[in-house]
């Protein structure tokens, strides 16, 4: 069975609706961390974008889920639908192949 990890970085305000949507889409577990970061816009708001603007790290949520490879497109579509506003700060999605998973309690791989 091929697995992938989908990692999402988005604003704190979007987390609750994203969590509900992922649960409804069949995601059975997730890891969530509060992080600080910014993208190429250096943490600016849309009306502030400036080449010389000093980088500002903004509070974000980082959500990681592991799903079967055949579920990736469906889950990514759910994420994009929940996060999209068309404005700076909607978020980022990263997708990684998982080589192996070991359940510590049982040793199952």
Regions found by a protein language model. Name each.
Residues 1-109:
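Positively charged, small/polar-rich N-terminal and surface patches that mediate targeting and assembly
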């Amino acid at each position: 069975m091929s697995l992938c990890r989908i990692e999402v970085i988005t604003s704190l305000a979007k987390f609750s609706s994203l969590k509900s949507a992922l649960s409804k889409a069949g995601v059975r577990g997730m890891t969530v961390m509060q992080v600080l970061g910014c993208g190429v816009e250096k943490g600016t708001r849309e009306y502030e974008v400036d080449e010389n603007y000093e980088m500002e790290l903004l509070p974000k949520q980082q959500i990681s889920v592991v799903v079967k490879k055949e579920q990736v497109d469906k889950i990514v579509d759910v994420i994009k639908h929940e996060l999209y506003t068309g404005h700076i700060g909607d978020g980022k999605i990263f997708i990684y192949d998982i080589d192996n998973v070991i359940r510590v309690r049982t040793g199952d791989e």
